């Protein structure tokens, strides 16, 4: 009987904890992110998915201007004056896939030849889209028993457009 009371008290405590904590939002696996590229440079839409990606790392580089005015008693003031977005990708070279082939085909390109458009569809439904340049860093390679690698950076070229997820 004592064990039953203890079990019931524990269950009640757990139920109360869940009730008290409230909604903490959703979590999603990284593979729910989708990345699209325009395979005609900047003349079309970013509607071709890039297949074979295993990892991505977004990085925002902020330009910060710092100054130390005399009236701040030696404390530094800061202002973010610009930003840049880099999406680093690594994955497998998937021959025959339009998005993967397009990216790998830019390995020797420079200038206008590596300009494109991108769209990042996040698990929440939000999107980030805009102009970009593509820097292929590893078009293939690996150990003899590995699958060919594809690594590249997608760098924003101007301010991308963020569209929040629609609330349903």
Predicted regions and their residues:
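Solvent-exposed edge beta-strands and adjacent loop segments
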Residues: 20-94, 131-148
């Amino acid at each position: 009987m004592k064990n039953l009371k203890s079990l019931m008290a524990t269950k009640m405590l757990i139920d109360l904890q869940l009730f008290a904590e409230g909604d903490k939002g959703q979590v999603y696996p990284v593979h729910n992110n989708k990345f699209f590229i325009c395979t005609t440079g900047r003349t079309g839409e970013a509607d071709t998915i890039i297949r074979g990606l295993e990892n991505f790392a977004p990085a925002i580089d902020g330009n910060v201007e710092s100054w130390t005015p005399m009236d701040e008693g030696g404390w530094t003031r800061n202002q973010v004056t610009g930003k840049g977005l880099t999406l680093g990708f690594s994955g497998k070279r998937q021959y025959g896939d339009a998005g993967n082939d397009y990216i790998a085909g830019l390995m020797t390109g420079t200038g206008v030849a590596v300009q494109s458009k991108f769209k990042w569809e996040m698990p929440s439904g939000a999107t980030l889209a805009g102009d970009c340049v593509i820097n292929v860093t590893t078009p293939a390679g690996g150990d003899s028993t590995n699958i060919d690698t594809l690594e590249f950076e997608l760098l924003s070229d101007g301010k991308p457009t963020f569209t929040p997820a629609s609330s349903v």
